[in-house]
């Protein structure tokens, strides 16, 4: 058995420019000059002109004006500055002055940071009094702020404040970090383009970019090279640390470009939520590396989630992540958290679609690579042309699915509180490697976790490898699997860990009062036929609780004297399956033995072998082409030679599906019989009488059409030509199968009576 322990956790814890004038000024000009001088003396506002602002000259405050920004520095305000650029005179020396941006409701403030270095970190000299410390750059207000990056910018804030701070409230606007122009202000689009950068470091309990201590954070990034590091309890990009009163901690982050490196503090996500915070992260483009350095925070997603007594209501931890483009180079979760998904105890809701590429998603111990952290369920959809190169849990979490569930003593028995990994993989999605280090499934449930998995469409799975006692696809240790595979799916290797099924249940799963079973459904559809290779886990040589080898498809094994959960397995249509048991039964369970199937379609091949390599195939596992009819046999040449079926090409012939779209077909000829095959339930073969006449001249006497879920139908070439003897060569012949029904038309007229 796997030993699991419960956790006890606590959060510890600009100057006027002078000019020499030689001409005498008019009275009006002298009056204007006097007025200007008076304004400077009493701190009144100046008329607008664009200029650079140097951070060494004092704190800078910016707000939205009527036709630009109102900028205040050193007691002087300039109105309607049309191009606000903040610089450092010497970027190698940090300034302790700050920038505050306040965008009013319905307004937009545009600011450029150009090689600015600010460091206002004073350690903890004032104790726990966040208001006594300073923020390098703070963004507030109900309007929107856009910050353009030129050169290299570095922002380091004090205790309790984010490096670049934007606290999300009910009426706050948005903060967008961008790199739309080159450093010289020119438009991008050439080989000499420059990239602006930002390095932001948050203080204690505060994000690198986003929320301060006790606050939610909102950030949008569209470009630039961004490096963000959160303080203890906070996200690298996203929320500051929240609290058990559900105040703060949430992170709302959108990324549509740039190169991002984000590191969360302990309990915080790399990108997403801080401690006690949820993470909502949307990625449409960019190159991202996100890490949670301590415990309980996801790489991308939720921070630490808690269920404080007496309510037991979950606060934080949830991760809602949508990735529709770009590349996630690495997403690493902390201990008990997912690489992409939720933190400790949270729900991991993850959608990966479009052309997104996940190079490496690494869950911490007991957290999934993609999915949920410990004690959390997951809802995962991977679709479109998304590619997952590697998704892995170091131990007890699924590669893709849920984190570890709970198992604890109760009297003389044990209570099992499983997590649930709901995973759908569809479209043209490709999973190259999904793996658990120990206890969890490759795809499905973590240890003490149920795996509900749907794989369909044209999805491809390379390796799905369970850890010890975890299924390749299905349940983790002590968990059942409910797996549906349908369509043109390829699974190259579903490998169960010791005692667990390749596809199906984890090891040591015993029957419950509701007779819950491992369920596996495999079937072909119009999209095509599944091609699956699965292997059950081998023997577990544990002197305390040894386990026998498990089925390739079906149930995991149990310890001596225990009862194995039964399996319900259905296979329909045309399939190709290579199943190798880790024990005696390849497809099924130890109680009922091998599961037999009937009524499968022509072309089906199921190969079964036990752990010794013996063939344990069953009747109906291999379905060949139907034997020729008596008429076909009589028409065959009596040369005494053996005819061999060979592939042929019929020029102009094509096959469509129910939507009228062309689908793949093959043609083979055996003697005088030509067979057209298509992987479709509703399919139509399109010929012309000219094609049929050519085939007759080539010696073909019988045509056969074979599709999924339909008997093969035949037609005599002579009978077909005799039906419309005077019709021109271009006359259309359409031969349709709709499930078990068949129809034949010539120039739109029904001639189905010719079919046999």
Predicted regions mapped to residue ranges:
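Short, Lys/Arg-rich N-terminal segment immediately upstream of the first membrane anchor
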Residues: 15-27
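Residue-level detector of functional hotspots within protein domains
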Residues: 26, 30, 660
């Amino acid at each position: 058995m796997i030993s699991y322990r419960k956790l006890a956790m606590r959060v510890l814890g600009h100057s006027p420019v002078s000019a020499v004038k030689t001409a005498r000024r008019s009275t009006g000009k002298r009056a204007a000059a006097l007025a200007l001088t008076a304004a400077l003396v009493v701190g009144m506002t100046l008329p607008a002109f664009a200029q650079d602002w140097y951070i060494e000259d004092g704190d800078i405050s910016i707000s939205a004006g009527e036709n630009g920004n109102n900028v205040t520095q050193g007691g002087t305000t300039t109105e309607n500055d049309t191009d606000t650029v903040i610089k450092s005179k010497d970027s190698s020396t940090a300034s302790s002055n700050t920038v505050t941006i306040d965008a009013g409701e319905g307004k937009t403030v545009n600011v450029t940071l150009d090689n600015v270095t600010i460091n206002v970190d004073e350690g903890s000299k004032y104790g726990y009094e966040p208001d006594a410390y300073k923020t390098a750059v703070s963004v507030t207000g109900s309007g929107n702020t856009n910050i353009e990056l030129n050169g290299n910018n570095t922002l380091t804030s004090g205790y309790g404040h984010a490096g670049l701070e934007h606290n999300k409230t009910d009426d706050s606007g948005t903060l967008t970090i961008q790199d739309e122009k080159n450093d010289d202000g020119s438009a991008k689009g050439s080989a000499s383009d420059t990239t602006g950068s930002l390095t932001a470091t948050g203080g204690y309990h505060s994000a690198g970019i986003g929320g301060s201590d006790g606050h939610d954070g909102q950030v949008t990034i569209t470009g630039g090279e961004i490096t963000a590091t959160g303080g203890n309890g906070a996200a690298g990009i996203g929320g500051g640390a929240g609290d058990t009163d559900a105040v703060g901690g949430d992170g709302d982050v959108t990324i549509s470009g740039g190169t991002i490196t984000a590191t969360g503090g302990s309990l915080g996500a790399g990108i997403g939520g801080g401690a006690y915070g949820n993470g909502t992260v949307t990625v449409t483009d960019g190159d991202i590396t996100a890490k949670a350095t301590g415990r309980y925070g996801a790489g991308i997603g939720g921070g630490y989630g808690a269920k404080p007594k007496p309510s037991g209501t979950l606060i934080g931890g949830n991760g809602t992540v949508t990735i529709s483009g770009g590349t996630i180079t690495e997403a690493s979760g902390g201990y008990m958290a997912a690489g992409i998904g939720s933190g400790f105890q949270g729900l991991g809701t993850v959608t990966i679609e479009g052309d997104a590429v996940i190079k490496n998603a690494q869950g911490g111990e007991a957290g999934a690579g993609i999915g949920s952290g410990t004690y959390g369920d997951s809802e995962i959809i991977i679709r479109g042309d998304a590619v997952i190169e590697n998704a892995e849990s170091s131990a007890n979490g699924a590669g893709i699915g849920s984190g570890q569930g709970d198992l604890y003593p109760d009297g003389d028995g044990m209570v099992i509180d499983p997590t649930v990994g709901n995973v759908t993989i569809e479209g043209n999605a490709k999973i190259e490697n999904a793996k658990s280090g120990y206890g969890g499934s490759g795809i499905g449930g973590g240890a003490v976790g149920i795996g509900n998995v749907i794989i369909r469409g044209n999805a491809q799975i390379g390796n799905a490898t369970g850890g010890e006692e975890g299924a390749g696809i299905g349940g983790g240790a002590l968990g059942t699997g409910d797996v549906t595979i349908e369509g043109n799916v390829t699974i190259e290797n579903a490998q169960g860990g010791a005692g667990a099924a390749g596809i199906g249940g984890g090891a040591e799963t015993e029957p419950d009062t509701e007779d819950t079973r491992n369920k596996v459904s495999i079937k072909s559809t119009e999209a095509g036929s599944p091609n699956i290779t699965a292997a059950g886990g081998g023997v577990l040589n544990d002197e305390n609780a040894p386990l026998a080898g498990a089925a390739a498809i079906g149930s995991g094994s149990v310890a001596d004297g225990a009862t194995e959960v039964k399996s319900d397995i259905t296979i329909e249509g045309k399939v190709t399956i290579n199943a190798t048991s880790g024990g005696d039964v390849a497809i099924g369970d130890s109680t009922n033995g091998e599961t037999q199937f009937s009524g499968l379609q022509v072309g089906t091949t199921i190969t079964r072998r036990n752990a010794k390599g013996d063939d344990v195939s069953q009747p109906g596992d291999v379905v060949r082409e139907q034997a020729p009819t008596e008429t076909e046999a009589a028409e065959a040449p009596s040369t005494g030679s053996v005819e061999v079926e060979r592939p042929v090409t019929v020029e102009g012939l094509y096959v469509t599906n129910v939507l009228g779209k062309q689908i793949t077909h093959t043609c083979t000829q055996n003697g005088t019989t030509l067979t057209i095959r298509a992987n479709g339930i509703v399919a139509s073969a399109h010929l012309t009488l000219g094609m049929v006449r050519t085939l007759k001249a080539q010696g073909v006497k019988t045509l056969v059409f074979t599709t999924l879920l339909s008997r093969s139908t035949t037609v005599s070439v002579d009978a077909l030509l005799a039906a419309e003897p005077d019709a021109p060569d271009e006359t259309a012949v359409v031969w349709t199968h709709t499930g078990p029904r068949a129809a034949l038309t010539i120039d739109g007229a029904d001639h189905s009576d010719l079919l046999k």
